[in-house]
Structures are given as C-alpha cells and as structure tokens.
Amino acid sequence: AESTQSVNTIYLDNNKVVGHNTDIKGFELGIKDSKFKATGKKILILGAGGVVPSIICALNKMKVSGITISNRTKDRAESLKIFFKNIKIVDWGEIPEFDMIINATSVGLNKDDQIDLNFSKVGKNKFFYDVIYNPKETSFLKIGKKLGNETENGKLMFIYQAFTAFK
C-alpha cells in the first residue's frame, strides 16, 4: 500500500489496523493467466488515476523493459514520477512503440464511450488490456481486436484482487 499510496483492504492484526493494496497482485495474476508474457516488454498505459500506481508496481515486479504513461492531464501523469522514476510521460494522443497497451481510464464504462486516440498505425501482435470488465468488450478492446491484436478485459484482475483481499 505504501508504494502505491493506495489502500483497498484493511484488517486487524494484533489490535492494529493494517492497510493493504490487493490491486497489485490482482493485476499481476490476471496478466500471468493471459497469453501475454510481460517480461522484457514495452508497456503503454493510458490514464494516471487511482489504479495506475498498482499497475506500475506489478509491471516492475514482472520486469518489463519500459513503462510509458499518457494521460489527458499531463500534470497528473508527471506526478507519478515522484514515486516511479523509471516511467516516461508522453502527450495524450502520442502513441509510442509498445507491446502491451493498458486502458486505465474511465473511457469505456459507458457502452457508447469512444476513446479519442488514433490506433491506425499500431499494427498486429500487440496486447490490448482494459481494466474495465463491464461491459465485457469496450470500444478500446474492439479497436484492438479489429486491428488483429490479442485483447483482455479486467475481469481476472478483479477476481484475483478480491481473492487476495479475502486471504
């Protein structure tokens, strides 16, 4: 919880309240269950909100080769560098080379949401991951699939996060 500045599970340990973050393990286990092997890969994260520090921690544990963040509000993305010196920040709309792209924005929660990015030059053999699991297939995932890429929603992350919380 300290590394992410985020707590989503609390419990009593010898009459002391302890905070824990289960999103890190949830994301990590969810990715390990997918076909994507993260070690040595370049990652692009869209968004800089509450779940992103947990995703960065998990990706660092998986020994990815690089993490780039793109957020509509660049200052918010820049603030993540205080805790994560290894990340790069790019402007919203800029899509650098990546192996895996993660939608960690709220775009897609509503069925009619459309992500305002041009993915036409992305190509195939990439992994599109959306932390959103309802709807099951967001517009972001539909774009990834249409371009011939593997896609995965955040359902396994959610399941593993909950499972970890109950341990």
Model-derived regions: residue spans:
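Phosphate/diphosphate ligand-binding glycine-rich loop within oxidoreductases
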Residues: A1-S34, I143
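Short helix-loop-beta connector
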Residues: D13, F36-K42, G123-K124
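Glycine-rich adenosine-cofactor-binding loop
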Residues: N21, I31, G40-N60, V64, ...
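Active-site capping/gating segments
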Residues: L29, Y133-N134, E150-K167
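Conserved S-adenosyl-L-methionine
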Residues: K61-G66, K146-E150
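NAD(P)-binding Rossmann-fold cofactor-contacting core
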Residues: M62-F84
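Rossmann-like adenosine-cofactor binding region
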Residues: K85-E152
